[in-house]
Amino acid sequence: MADHTEVMQGINKLPGISYPVLTPNLKGFQAAVAAGAKEVSIFGAASELFTKKNINCSIEESLERFDEVMTAAKAASIPVRGYVSCVLGCPYEGKISAAKVAEVSKKMYSMGCYEISLGDTIGIGTPGSMKEMLTAVMKEVPVGALAVHCHDTYGQALANILVALQMGVSVVDASVAGLGGCPYAQGASGNVATEDLVYMLNGLGIHTGVDLQKLMDTGTYICNALNRRTNSKVSQASCRL
């Protein structure tokens, strides 16, 4: 995150689009606001070991740090989104209990996060575990304040997202060309490809307002810039890369 000020200042910001910045603590929040951020995100986890590896503290300590960020954000009228990582499994602890996910989600929502994004960080979840986890979390957080964030490491992302949609979740995180990963979860692939998600939503008759052709063109652009191959099955099938 050392160059986020440069990145923020270099973005050609368009109306109607949010450019949230990940802020692990008050210092990060202050730097983000100074760089022009109008929305921030705090990122916790349902795994003690992952939290220690990721932000070098316990879950309880991370929540205390987030409380400082929330207080400052409220004072500045800046909306905050909350992320909970490892909701369906952890690279260090293995299976994570749905009750723990619900507990952390409830605490972050109660702090004032307008939305809680539930992340399958290592992409190990299945439709069954997604349903079990969401059932537990929805008892503590309104479904209208939930989002899912599915990595596609095991090829389960779209199936898991479909379950979430059927359970009432209407916000889904995705990544153009499926780029990304996690430095603290070796072997984890990127988030579900936005192209594949939009293709599926189109097939379900769900209007997204996203132009699939332009989306694929964007994927082609960034993959060429990074010298990477797209992870989007839709783009691969369209022979774009």
Feature roles, as predicted:
Residues 1-241:
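Catalytic cores and adjacent flexible loops of soluble metabolic enzymes
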